[in-house]
Swiss-Prot record:
Binding-site residues for Hg(2+), renumbered to this chain: G22, A25
Keyword Membrane among UniProt keywords: yes
Activation and inhibition: Uptake of Hg(2+) is decreased by iodoacetamide and iodoacetate, and is completely inhibited by the thiol-modifying reagent N-ethylmaleimide (NEM).
Effect of disrupting the coding gene: Mutation does not affect resistance to mercury.
Name of the coding gene: merC
Organism, as annotated: Shigella flexneri
Name of the protein this chain belongs to: Mercuric transport protein MerC
Amino acid sequence: MGLMTRIADKTGALGSVVSAMGCAACFPALASFGAAIGLGFLSQYEGLFISRLLPLFAALAFLANALGWFSHRQWLRSLLGMIGPAIVFAATVWLLGNWWTANLMYVGLALMIGVSIWDFVSPAHRRCGPDGCELPAKRL
């Protein structure tokens, strides 16, 4: 993955989690963790975080993972990287107001964090170049 898509992916994931930490009424587990590390002052901005910033950061992470596919051509990595932001975006824009939206948001945020850690620990490598695709060597 290119440097810009890696930075955008990490920014999207981190921004989504910090935005969710600012909403004590919506996500009490994340809000208690946010208050423990000193983010309690963000509670006055929770409307802005949930309605504007959280979908924006989720869309940024989705776009970064979609553009990353053009670099490494690993569809499973890109798909897993795009599912989390899509869940977060759907929970904050289309499904807001349902009783299970917070649980869906937790799943999306956890998936975003998990894929970001996976990408940090094991970065994607290029599989296809302009001259064609290289297949891995066969084992006998």
